A protein has these predicted regions:
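Membrane-interface aromatic/basic loop that binds lipid-linked glycans or pyrophosphate carriers
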Residues: 271-326
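A conserved acidic beta->alpha catalytic loop
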Residues: 25, 40-50, 68, 91
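Acidic helix N-cap motif at the loop->helix transition within catalytic regions
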Residues: 18-20, 45-53, 95, 99
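Catalytic core of nucleotide-sugar-dependent glycosyltransferases
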Residues: 208-215, 221-249, 265-292
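Short, acidic, metal-binding catalytic loop of nucleotide-sugar glycosyltransferases
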Residues: 24-33
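Short aromatic/hydrophobic "clamp" motif used to bind/position activated sugar donors
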Residues: 87
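Glycine-rich, basic loop-to-helix element that forms the pyrophosphate-binding segment
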Residues: 66-82, 92
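Donor-binding/catalytic cores of nucleotide-activated saccharide
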Residues: 71, 92-202, 212-226
Length: 326
């Protein structure tokens, strides 16, 4: 077993504005032999120069440069060179709060079979850092079955497939051949597979991750039809992974229902916030896959049986929210 507990993998591409703040937030709690692996995805700005200027003298900060292939490919390359027992995928424009490494260390010492470490996260606006809101909020805590953690997140509406949402034992990736496959939505299948393949999770109520929302991204980032179709394909692939899992039957049935409802809502909201019609293939998926689901509320019944009415009602809510965003 490696003496290195944690490898933090940071995929970087043209993030000269953010990389120092990100790495500095990690260095406050990471010392050798733990390591920070910066995977330079062929940046064309000053990212590499800044990393060399600030961190070339630190043994725990390592940088590798690869041909441009997207964040998922960069994470895969980072896993290949990582020497830690655990890996943590951190985005280069975000910030990690103090305490993550110390709690992880204590958990692994007390519960050595833990292979997934989950924590809360928040988001903040780049132009107004004092404006923050919860991102991932766990309702469970302590030692848990990872599939129960996933179900609870789906139920409370704070599940995200983002790979920065957990710390993972590296052998899980190796034994199950987990990889980030695509440039876009590359983490959907990976993250769900993580929750399904892991055997023991520790859930803390501490908020250790702070996601930066760049200026204008809430309202001004128009998404193309290709984006929505790729997002839909990621949903289908991930749902198929869930259906093929070997989870206990009642739990699997509950996870399938929760994941479908979560995904249907999310794809609808993505279109509404983009101020574009919900694609017909999404509506067809709701009509076809929704037939296997028994609604637990009026809102779920509308979503599954009359998606057009559900969309109309939610569109009024979204329009009001967009008007409030300065």
């Amino acid at each position: 077993m490696s003496d290195i507990l944690l490898s933090v993998i940071i995929p970087t591409y043209n993030v000269e504005k953010y990389i120092v703040e990100c790495v500095d937030s990690l260095l406050r709690q990471i010392s050798a032999p733990n390591e920070i692996i910066i995977v330079n995805d062929s940046s064309t700005d000053g990212t590499v120069a800044l990393v060399e200027q600030h961190y070339s003298h630190l043994p725990q900060v390592k940088m590798i440069t690869i041909a441009n292939g997207g964040a998922g490919n960069a994470r895969d390359k980072g896993v290949e060179v990582a020497q830690g027992q655990f890996v943590f995928f951190c985005d280069p424009d975000d910030v990690v709060a103090d305490g993550l490494v110390s709690e992880l260390t204590q958990v692994v010492e007390n519960y050595p079979d833990t292979d997934l470490f989950c924590f809360n996260s928040s988001a903040y606006r780049e132009d107004k850092p004092h404006i923050t809101w919860p991102k991932v909020r766990h309702s469970l805590s302590g030692i848990q079955r990872p599939q129960d953690v996933l179900l609870a997140l789906l139920h409370n509406g704070s599940y995200t497939s983002a790979a920065w949402n957990y710390v993972l034992r590296k052998t899980v990736i190796q034994q199950h051949h987990l990889r980030f496959v695509d440039r876009v939505h590359e983490d959907h299948n990976f993250t769900l597979s993580v929750f399904m393949k892991c055997k023991q999770a520790w859930v803390t109520q501490q908020t250790y991750y702070k996601q930066r929302i760049r200026s204008g991204s809430l309202t001004n980032s128009s998404k193309s039809p290709t984006f929505f179709f790729q997002r839909y394909n990621a949903f289908i692939a991930t749902f198929n992974t869930l259906c093929s899992s070997r989870a206990e039957s009642e739990l699997k049935k509950a996870l399938e229902k929760a994941y479908l409802i979560h995904s249907f809502r999310l794809m609808i909201y993505l279109s509404l916030y983009n101020q574009t019609p919900v694609p017909e293939y999404v509506l067809n998926a709701i009509r076809y896959l929704g037939r296997r689901i028994k609604a637990s509320s009026l809102k779920e019944w509308l979503l599954l049986n009359s998606p057009e009415t559900f969309i109309l009602l939610q569109s009024h809510k979204v329009k009001k929210e967009l008007k409030r965003v300065p």
